[in-house]
């Protein structure tokens, strides 16, 4: 969901009696729209008979862009510090949800039901390697890949191949200064 927040007319009636401000109601209708679209997608791949071979990845690209200080607002990154364009966790840590539409018994990459795994770092650079491995494809010879497959993490296991460090270089002036941050384990260096 990204600004500007224009209400999805299919769901606005669900929030008419809410005492939340208009932007929060609009945001809620957009979340309902995402939920409906995801359900439609899952129904479609099930009808086509490919649900057991379909992995859905839901990923954010950056933290919320909500105003700082509005800890309980619908656009907040709380309890994380910061927001989009900042060097803090609220600007860089985002949801990454992976799930098979229907986990087949024969699927070697099955994700355990109700399983949450958040002990290892992952980045959008890892998506390409993950899709290659899960899809049984090989990286073209000579093609350099910066990411690591998240297949083990998506199966609830730790991946010993995935380093525990991450560097973010942000050479843009987006409501903040330019910055570089380096994270290793529980530590982060910000420059």
Feature-to-residue mapping (PLM):
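Active-site-proximal beta-strand/loop segments in catalytic clefts of secreted hydrolases
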Residues: 1, 8, 59-62, 100-101, ...
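Active-site His/acidic residue clusters
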Residues: 1-26, 65-74
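Active-site regions of oxyanion-processing enzymes, predominantly non-cytosolic
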Residues: 1-14, 42, 46-55, 89, ...
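C-terminal cap/loop subdomain of S1 sulfatases and analogous C-terminal strand-loop tails that border
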Residues: 64-87, 106, 110-116, 120, ...
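Metal-dependent active-site segment of extracytoplasmic phospho-/sulfohydrolases and closely related
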Residues: 33-72
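Stable alpha-helical elements in mature extracytoplasmic
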Residues: 11, 23, 27-30, 34-37, ...
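Beta-strand elements within well-structured catalytic alpha/beta cores of enzymes
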Residues: 1, 31, 38, 55-60, ...
């Amino acid at each position: 969901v990204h600004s500007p927040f224009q209400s999805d007319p299919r769901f606005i009636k669900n929030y008419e009696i809410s005492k939340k401000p208009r932007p929060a109601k609009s945001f809620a209708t957009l979340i309902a729209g995402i939920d409906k679209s995801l359900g439609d997608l899952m129904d479609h791949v099930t009808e086509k008979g490919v649900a057991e071979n379909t992995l859905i990845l839901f990923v954010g690209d950056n933290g919320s862009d909500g105003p700082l200080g509005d800890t309980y607002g619908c656009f907040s990154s709380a309890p994380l510090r910061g927001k989009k364009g900042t060097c803090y966790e609220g600007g860089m840590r985002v949801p990454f949800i992976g799930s098979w539409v229907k986990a087949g018994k024969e699927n070697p990459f099955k994700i355990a039901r109700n399983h949450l795994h958040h002990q290892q770092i992952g980045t959008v650079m890892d998506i390409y390697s993950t899709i290659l491995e899960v899809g049984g494809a090989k990286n073209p010879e000579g093609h350099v890949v910066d990411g690591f497959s998240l297949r083990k993490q998506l199966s609830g296991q730790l991946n010993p191949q995935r380093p525990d460090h991450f560097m973010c270089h942000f050479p843009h002036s987006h409501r903040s200064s330019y910055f570089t941050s380096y994270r290793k384990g529980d530590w982060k260096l910000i420059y």
